[in-house]
Amino acid sequence: MKMIKNEIENKILNVRRRPANMRKILKVGKPLSATYSHSAHTLSILAAEDDNKGWLLNCFVQLFGDRCDFLDYQDFGFMECPIIDTQHIGIDMVDIGWKSRIDFIKMAIINDYYVYAELNTSKIKAYGQSVVFAHDALIYGFDEENKQFLIADFFQHKKYGNTWIEEDELKN
């Protein structure tokens, strides 16, 4: 337990020692398939590394047949991917452990963690919606000078892509 605490403290110190107006973007690539957010996000992370291509082509199968009439389209995501290490951190823990959710997201990205989070699409212009709706997005970059975050999801025209959003949009 003490080792974990020291590791977390070291990561927090690294965030505090970082340069002002930092910009960091984690690598993503074009996903092999972009049908649902959870699989598109996972596949875009995996597509960033050429070494993953063999695994994807040999092990990722989205189409399958079964005698069951029920079709389950939720068969793949980051939690099921054996070559991605995931951690589930509840928003209550984020609120307890960090000054703000924005600071948590920045710290995660600085330490090379992608952030998968449900966002209120009515607060983010790129979605082009006014109705309150939660949708899972991938946050993988930030720019402190412009106060923006880089996210990937299915935006206004329902095509998977990425865009920079204002920090205030993410706060809401």
Where do the PLM segments sit?
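Conserved active-site-adjacent core of cysteine acyl-enzyme catalytic domains
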Residues: 4-172
